[in-house]
């Protein structure tokens, strides 16, 4: 199961106060705040106050804060802040994406999967029986190298800026990936498939890879 820390709650409280003082939009957050389907038809925030809680608890510097703005289940903008490296990844759909104050320019380099680096993870919701594991392996085995960062948000940020070539994870919560999806959408030419069913999501992202394959929802 996901680890929950006092730091998650403290971060969430601060973010909630800042957002509610500045805006009237409802907030969907991992720890405490849920919204209705009707509210999701309008503009709303999706917040993960501390993505990579286990890393944080073990002093592994792969964790971040993730905040996204959505309207009718579609991304408008997103911010991922890596407080260990003081790196702010941000994106506005239709405008562009940035790493701190530098605009992210997607690479034109097209790679075969056999030469690409994939980030992935083992979700708390994932089916770990034989069939579930075989499906997982079938989706990652073509890649040259596999990395498990322990933070879905940072994994997507790294795809956006070209540090990693692709990301795949099944049965992951929307707040883990919402800001990353917004940043990818802001870049425009990164292919991703995203399917949402309540709190469980299936996401695959590829940055300039050959032989792209869509993953269809079951």
What are these regions, as identified by a protein language model?
Residues 1-50:
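N-terminal subdomain of lithium-sensitive/metallo-dependent phosphomonoesterases centered on the IMPase/IPPase/PAP
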Residues 8, 19, 53, 82, ...:
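Residue-level signal for inorganic ion chemistry
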Residues 9, 31, 49-52, 83, ...:
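Generic detector of well-ordered alpha-helical packing
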Residues 37-39, 90, 109-113:
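Solvent-exposed alpha-helices and their adjacent loops that cap or buttress functional pockets
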Residues 39-98:
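DPxDG-like acidic metal-binding loop motif
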Residues 76, 104-107:
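Short, isolated positions in well-ordered beta-strands
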Residues 99-103:
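A structural micro-motif at secondary-structure boundaries
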Residues 106-218:
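An extended, acidic
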